[in-house]
Amino acid sequence: MRWLSSTWLSDLSCSSSSVIEPSSSLPAPIQWLRFILLSPCPQRLLSSTVDVLFLLILFFFAIQKLCSSSSSRTNGEADITKPLLGRRTRTRTTGLFKTTVVVTIVLSFCSLVLCVSAFFTTRTKLKLVDTLFWLIHAVTNVVIAVLVLHLKRFASPSHPLTLRIYWVFNFVVTTLFTVSGILHLLSDDPAAASLRADDVASFISFPLTAVLLLVSIKGSTGVVVTTSNVTAPAKSNDVVVEKSENVSLYASASFISKTFWLWMNPLLRKGYKSPLNLDQVPTLSPEHRAEKLATLFESKWPKPQENSRNPVRTTLIRCFWKEIAFTAVLAIIRLSVIYVGPVLIQSFVDFTSGKRSSPSQGYYLVLILLIAKFVEVLSTHQFNFNSQKLGMLIRSTLITALYKKGLKLTGSARQNHGVGQIVNYMAVDAQQLSDMMLQLHAIWLMPLQVAAAIVLLYNTLGPSVVTTVIGLTGIFVFILLGTKRNNRYQFSLMMNRDSRMKATNEMLNYMRVIKFQAWEDHFNERILKFREMEFGWLSKFLYSIAGNIIVLWSTPVLISALTFTTAVFLGVKLDAGTVFTTTTIFKILQEPIRTFPQSMISLSQAMISLGRLDAYMMSRELSEETVERSQGCDGNVAVEIKDGSFSWDDEDDEPAIENINFEVKKGELAAIVGTVGSGKSSLLASVLGEMHKLSGKVRVCGTTAYVAQTSWIQNGTVQDNILFGLPMNRSKYNEVLKVCCLEKDMQIMEFGDQTEIGERGINLSGGQKQRIQLARAVYQESDVYLLDDVFSAVDAHTGSDIFKKCVRGALKGKTILLVTHQVDFLHNVDRILVMRDGMIVQSGKYDELVSSGLDFGELVAAHETSMELVEAGSASATAANVPMASPITQRSISIESPRQPKSPKVHRTTSMESPRVLRTTSMESPRLSELNDESIKSFLGSNIPEDGSRLIKEEEREVGQVSFQVYKLYSTEAYGWWGMILVVFFSVAWQASLMASDYWLAYETSAKNEVSFDATVFIRVYVIIAAVSIVLVCLRAFYVTHLGLKTAQIFFKQILNSLVHAPMSFFDTTPSGRILSRASTDQTNVDIFIPFMIGLVATMYTTLLSIFIVTCQYAWPTVFFIIPLGWLNIWYRGYYLASSRELTRLDSITKAPVIHHFSESIAGVMTIRAFKKQPMFRQENVKRVNANLRMDFHNNGSNEWLGFRLELIGSWVLCISALFMVMLPSNIIKPENVGLSLSYGLSLNGVLFWAIYLSCFIENKMVSVERIKQFTDIPAEAKWEIKESRPPPNWPYKGNIRLEDVKVRYRPNTPLVLKGLTIDIKGGEKIGVVGRTGSGKSTLIQVLFRLVEPSGGKIIIDGIDICTLGLHDLRSRFGIIPQEPVLFEGTVRSNIDPTEKYSDEEIWKSLERCQLKDVVASKPEKLDSLVADNGENWSVGQRQLLCLGRVMLKRSRILFLDEATASVDSQTDAMIQKIIREDFSDCTIISIAHRIPTVMDCDRVLVIDAGKAKEYDSPVRLLERQSLFAALVQEYALRSAGI
């Protein structure tokens, strides 16, 4: 570095003779540029020019303002618009203002002192010039100080733009002065022994001007104006916070506090004393909250006329350009000081070798090293923190924007993206962009950092650097190609992981059906297949990353070997300073080589995410113009559609419903009827504006309420679901419970209306969910009610009560559109709309439509056919002289209509010739009148939930340190302790080889070996050591990868096996989101992060040990400082980890509710929009986002709090070591050992931080192992197969079932649900099971399938006690059609025959019998036709028929029907019943039904009430006597009669 001795470094003159040095090898232009930037004379000229320009501009603006004020006073207009009495205001200042004032005053004082000093001490020739320079600078700084102080008086929220620009230029000039001063101190010029005034000024001014630079970027003055009404500055970024809130101290922290993370101290103190809980973590600062960011994002969204192609990217840049610029400045500051250490190695080596001009030079070197390391550490962690904070703000902004968009999407757009994909936009793409912020600047910083390194290496090694460039280029290309390969592998890995997660989610959602069908093995194998594909890509991905890591860790030693070989060949002298400066620069270059390719890939992924988000955010929204809505409109029409044609597809002109013309008057009840798939629900959707309007006009008068066919229940309390955001009105609330028949439910539920409803209403019966939905609608008191098949899931009595008390009672006077399959209610509606093939084919009153026949006649005929079964039973009772009647007077109905062949039988008379006795006029029945009224009322009015207690448990959360058992479990799962021992061995051996190479370099470059230096031996030995090092790092990397993969696969199989064989009660009490988080986030941590972190921790600690060994070996007094500082490190770790560990746990806990609420809202968006509750749901989303991000924010703060302190300790150890080296005599410490020690010590701060941080990181990630372990220890249900007790292959061969005193409770210490049930069912019998909602009907089926184990009694089927059988042997022998038809994503074939046991011929035969052959055959893919998630592209009726097809293929001897036809119309019901009667004539059938006709042709009927078998006999015999069943039949008949 010969150029450091140039005279122009200290010459204040601008003579050209100082510029060009003939001896220099640099070109003349480069020497001129160097002179202009680094010589004091041009620097002073530049500084004075900036000062003078600033003063002139300031003077110009002052004159202009003075003239303007004078003119205003002359015209008397200055105060004309001001109020006579101003509002009371108070001005306060934050730490930012105080810091700015202090800095400007200090700069002013220093400038004045230097001005006076220059006048009295400068030599005569330059006294005037020197004094004038400092005078101009002093005047400028004084003016700035006065200006800043006056900002408080004028209550200015932001600094003038002129001042902010000046501070930026002043920082640049001061940086040039500082660099020049450092070079001056390092030069060989004898004048460097004494400090110049310029050097002193620059060293003092540099940190101060850096502070002002940050202030200029922020823009805010820190002055806050508080009025009597509003406590917020007009335009300030400082937001005043309510004192009562537990707001993050970051909001009110001073500049110093933010700089050194002092604002984190109170929270860390709390966490150290006791484990943190949710309430102790402060909320976000107001400027960081989601609601403010959402408003900002919306205001910056490109206007339509801008025609932006990338609106999301454009908006994010507009919102956060200041934050992006600030992090860029921090990155540049870090880059400017990162190479100071390596440059100083040569100076230290020269100093200790005797080339010292004065003792003070050594102290100057230590001081420069200390300042450089401090700036590096501070800028690094401020960059990390602010980048993470920026990422957090972007994620928060995107989540709220995506959520708001999700509430506006059309049905077609929502289906195109899919609920799962929309959730991925929020969970994956937003996170991708957030994570990108840490790597954003690496893309343009990497070329600068490498270029700086090459320049330094060239000045050190000369032409030998060519080999370095070639080697680095080769490594860079290898890493780039490897990273691209990793990206491909990662993409495939994510795709396969998504498939595995989708299959897992599907399994969890429909676990009850899977257990009923004994498909656990099938789904286990299915998920394992997805996992095997995922594991294949995971292995490729991890081994590829291991290859990149090998190259990165080998870079310093590999490039050093190439470079030194070239240097020796070219005859370059290698001394200690040159060698260790080179190796240190190579170590620093590891970072950009590592980060740049990944940054490029991350940028590419971010651009893909932005493209996906652009497509989503630009998706079509529901048009407000689709429906004309008006409040308090004139006229009698409440709902009207004229010439309406509607499509579900925004781009398709093919209508789903067309030629719609109808109107419903205010207060009318209009029923919409039709067969399955006729368009009834679509008609309601068109009224709500949910469909794409192709033509026509839709008009709705007033507010709307909507009750969906498929219940949408929120995860919350019953009360929350009913209130739906409205305040509690107790009298109205109680009345709503009454009319919706929920009073008894509230009484029985353990917590009443505060009972928590599980995910998707899992702890409620179908009827309870439907009634809660209805109660929610009724409580809203809307004008127009759209009810979609609300009676399908409730029994006859409950349905009648709801119709009378609610529909015709509480909602009387409201306009109601009721979709229903219950023909019974149609007598009492004002208008009936009959639909077929997407059109309204008939419209009118009941009498009119019945007389016309056609479609409505067919519906009534189907209903009448089913009623004949009821009346036939009644006729039998009549024939036995047992008259049936009711205390209620019955109406006779006589309808005249022409009889036609095959027309429905609709004529009713009062003649006793008719066998339909239940429809005759009232007559007293002595036996029925003797029936206990209380028992009837209790039976008819009871709605006992089968399990009303709080099912959803709080998530288990460990506190304190992760136990040693968790570490032991992970470490020993694959190969016992030997696995971890090998990891440590390879790490220690590799580090030892690196130390050997460095010791060899020190030995060969020592002064005593200068004469006997043998280049061949030097290179040969170094290359051998380098090769050994590379082999060891290969072994370590690949072994850690293998160990991690094996352990991850073991854990996955354990948790999958545990889940598949978990009892149903586990899934009832555990939300699927909680399970999925284990299968996704926690499994990913075990798959990828933990293995490499363990390897890295071992490496970091062995590296740290090597640094301490080398440092203490040559600067042994340092050990006295290392011991206390080491203890301080350990204390900091424990202090930090206590809070960080809990924050990580809380982050996991608060993240799931954000995802759950997002997906829940998208699933129920029709309901939300119908009630106009979008603002309430957006607010809830914001609340959950803030709750989660506050954990993220404070966790990031704690990370940088720790990192800054640990790296600072490392820097102090380094500087203390360097101080001892310069203090020790040169005959005690050798120059080569100084170089070796410094080359190790320069990385001490980083290694120390990463060693501690990664160990904390592992502990946080070990929480994932802890959480997985919780689910691998789930108590399993009974054995899957019992070899000693296998039933015969043809079992059950008769179908005889005997229950002996069977008792069932769902969980210990809960009431019995079945209370001693004893019944006997003969083979081939058809048993109908009836009872009120929650009476225990479904529990009966569950205990027969052993989804819940009996608490007492026996169940004998064909002579075998089912509790002695394996679960698979039991369940696989039964057939069941569940209440809710479940289809899995896939094809028709995979749904009807999941286990692939049957031929295509058998499948087609089954489809033909269940009336679906024509539907499937009409599709191009036939049996491979697509079935969407949950069968959404198939109607409810078609889904039920497919479920019937499964049972027909299975041909089980015992068949269970669990309200299988509750959601279909009478025609479809009749068809299903006919198929079952014909195809299962010799089978035992147990049918649970709400529809009485379904059980009237059964051999026997079981009446269950409150868990007891109250009646069990044939329908005729039960009707012959005073029975509960008779009362139920009578109730149903009365309802059908329209009473």
Curated annotation (Swiss-Prot):
E.C. code: 7.6.2.2
Binding site for ATP 1: 674-681
Residues that, per the record, bind ATP 2: 1331-1338
Transmembrane parts of this sequence: 45-65, 100-120, 131-151, 165-185, 197-217, 247-267, 324-344, 363-383, 437-457, 461-481, 549-569, 976-996, 1015-1035, 1088-1108, 1112-1132, 1209-1229, 1238-1258
Renumbered residue ranges of the record's region Disordered: 896-916
Residue intervals of the ABC transmembrane type-1 domain: 324-605, 980-1260
UniProt-listed PANTHER family: ABC TRANSPORTER C FAMILY MEMBER 14 (PTHR24223:SF383), ATP-BINDING CASSETTE SUB-FAMILY C (PTHR24223)
Protein known as: ABC transporter C family member 14
Source organism of the structure: Arabidopsis thaliana
